[in-house]
Amino acid sequence: MSGRGKGGKVKAKAKSRSSRAGLQFPVGRIHRLLRKGNYGERVGAGAPVYLAAVMEYLAAEVLELAGNAARDNKKTRIIPRHLQLAIRNDEELNKLLSGVTIAQGGVLPNIQAVLLPKKTESKKA
C-alpha cells in the first residue's frame, strides 16, 4: 500500500462563478435560466459569464447616468423620471431602448425652433 487515495486533501471553500469572474450579477442563475428557457439544446460554460458581464455593464451605465440626473435635480433617490432622462439623453442607450416605455418617466423637454418667438432686432438710429 502506497498510502494514496485516503484523505489528505482538504476541500477548498466553494467559490461562486460570479466571484471568479469578478461580477456582481449571478452567473449560476443566468446559466440556469438559459438552460430552462429553450434558447438552445446546450449552453456553453462561458455564455452565462459573458451575458452576466454585459448585463452588469449596462445596469452600471444606466445607474451612473440616472444618478447624475438625480443629482442635477437635487435629489438623492433615483426615480423613473431620472431613468428616462438618462436614457433619452444618451444617444447609444436611446437607440438600444428606443422601443421601451418607462412608466412614470415623462417626456424630454423639447420645443421646435420654429415655434419659438422671433427675435426682434433693435433698430439703431
UniProtKB/Swiss-Prot annotation:
Species of the source: Chironomus thummi thummi
CDD domains linked to this entry: HFD_H2A
Family: Belongs to the histone H2A family.
GO cellular component, one term: nucleosome
Span list, region Disordered: 1-21
Keyword Cell inner membrane included in the entry's annotation: no
Function field: Core component of nucleosome. Nucleosomes wrap and compact DNA into chromatin, limiting DNA accessibility to the cellular machineries which require DNA as a template. Histones thereby play a central role in transcription regulation, DNA repair, DNA replication and chromosomal stability. DNA accessibility is regulated via a complex set of post-translational modifications of histones, also called histone code, and nucleosome remodeling.
SMART domains: H2A
Transmembrane residue ranges: none
UniProt-recorded name of the protein: Histone H2A
